Design a protein with these regions (language model features):
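Signature of short aromatic-glycine-proline-rich micro-motifs recurring in repeat-based ectodomains
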Residues: 55-63, 69-72, 219-229, 288-289, ...
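Repeat-based blade/solenoid architectures
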Residues: 51-57, 208, 214, 219, ...
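Preference for solvent-exposed, low-hydrophobicity sequence contexts
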Residues: 70-292, 296, 376, 388
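Acidic/polar, low-complexity intrinsically disordered N-terminal segments immediately downstream
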Residues: 1-75, 344-345, 356-399
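Structural WD40 beta-propeller signal
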Residues: 60-67, 114, 294-297, 335-340, ...
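Intrinsically disordered, low-complexity segments enriched in Gly and acidic/Ser/Thr residues
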Residues: 249-361
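Residue-level signature of beta-propeller blades and closely related beta-rich strand-turn architectures
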Residues: 24, 36, 78-80, 125-126, ...
Length: 399
């Protein structure tokens, strides 16, 4: 259990370690665990000159964003900003409004910067995209109504060209999709379509094999959104990682797995795959789940209730929950699999858990390769002394 605290990170140590986004009485604080020293450093943005930001959402490492000097995005209710790769230093030009057409002051809650051609985000119910063809384009609006949940489904495995993104309209209660390059191909004047429309465009452009899978026949409508997550998990080994979405219909909970490809077939064998369907309603206390996480190693889903983590084997029907671990006296505030960006890593499969007890945050990392996704007997690496952890990302080595 490591809880040493220092306020400032020595520059030489900044090249690798965990970045922990904390909510401290509603204020944003960024803490770090150095993988070099094993020590923790609190409030590392305090002396950077960055204005105080309220209600943190996400901390992202985005080496493919197009901003090589500042590959970190900090997302908060007060807006978003990039951070310098070497010192986390802040400049006014890092403020997200300078990346948006007309310098509109957006407040993105989610962002995907994996694709070679586009960056996308959702802010206040609308999706925005920026094209990266030669020069860094500005973000423009994809849909007019503020109806979208702050999650984006995307293929994180393939190096796609004309990516298709998955969205959920929580007003009209249906999946939607966006392909920013549709107008460039002359396939549609709009980038934003229903799933059935996007399927029809893909089939008309490249043939019937552009849509595959029979896990479900029709896309669901009328259900409430619960959660969405992108994974590297692909049962067909075709660079088509599954995006999972949890939906609720009254007291019933359902899971849909959708594979998202490329309209141009660049690096992807098809455009859309209906990969998975399951009924989660029989899983213990699923209606009380506060956090979800999906493995990229095995077909497993994890969810947290209070301080307890359950695992669901998605390959076994009917779906049922198996208790994995209990953090007595603690409340789990964040749970994820950190998907590494600089290359394949076995640590993609490590379960990362943030918890809180009396205002003190603790980070635990459970090695995913010891029991291949069964964490019940895995002893975690533990760090404590943080604020309430709302997100974490691993700061990988950078040049």
């Amino acid at each position: 259990l490591m809880c040493c605290k220092f306020n400032k990170v020595p520059p030489i140590l900044r090249n690798e370690g965990w970045l922990l986004l904390c909510d401290v009485n509603g204020k944003t604080r960024l803490d770090m665990v150095s993988n070099i020293t094993g020590q923790t450093y609190l409030d590392i943005l305090k002396s950077t000159g960055m204005p105080e930001l309220n209600h943190p959402y996400r901390i992202l490492y985005t080496p493919n964003s197009g901003y090589s000097d500042s590959p970190f995005y900090l997302l908060t209710a007060d807006g978003a900003t990039r951070l310098n790769k070497n010192s986390f230093a802040w400049k006014e030009e890092y403020a997200f409004k300078y990346e948006v057409a007309k310098q509109t002051d957006l407040h993105p809650q989610s962002m995907i910067c994996h694709n070679a051609m586009t960056n996308v985000c959702v802010s206040d119910g609308r999706m925005y995209y920026a094209l990266k063809s030669g020069i860094q384009g500005l973000y423009t609006e994809a849909n007019k109504q503020s109806v979208l949940v702050p999650y984006i489904g995307s293929n994180l495995v393939a190096s796609a060209f004309a990516s298709i993104y998955l969205l959920y309209d929580d007003v009209n209660k249906c999946f939607m999709s966006c392909c920013p390059l549709l107008p460039a191909f002359g396939l549609s004047n709009d980038t934003y379509h229903t799933m059935k429309e996007m399927e029809a465009i893909a089939v008309g452009f490249q043939g019937s094999d552009m849509v595959t899978g029979d896990a479900f026949s029709e896309y669901p409508t009328g259900m409430d959104f619960v959660y969405m997550e992108n994974t590297y998990y692909d049962p067909g080994n075709a660079d088509m990682g599954v995006t999972y979405t949890v939906l609720r219909d009254g007291q019933k909970y359902y899971l849909y797995g959708i594979q998202l490809g490329d309209m141009y077939k660049s690096g992807c064998p098809y455009a859309i795959g209906k990969a998975y369907y399951g009924d989660l309603s029989g899983c213990k206390d699923i209606n009380k789940a506060s956090c979800y996480a999906f493995s990229s190693l095995r077909n497993y889903m994890y969810y947290a209730v209070g301080g307890i983590v359950y695992r669901v084997n998605l390959s076994e029907k009917p779906l049922k929950a198996e208790k994995q671990l209990a953090l007595n006296g603690e409340t789990i505030t964040m749970m994820k699999f950190n998907l590494y960006q600089n290359g394949a890593s076995q640590h993609d499969y490590d379960l990362v858990v943030g918890s809180e007890n009396n205002g003190v945050g603790t980070l635990r990392i459970y090695d995913g390769m010891v029991k291949e996704g069964d964490f019940a007997t895995v002893k975690p690496t533990t760090y404590t002394g943080f604020g309430k952890i709302v997100d974490a990302t691993y700061r990988e080595r950078t040049n």
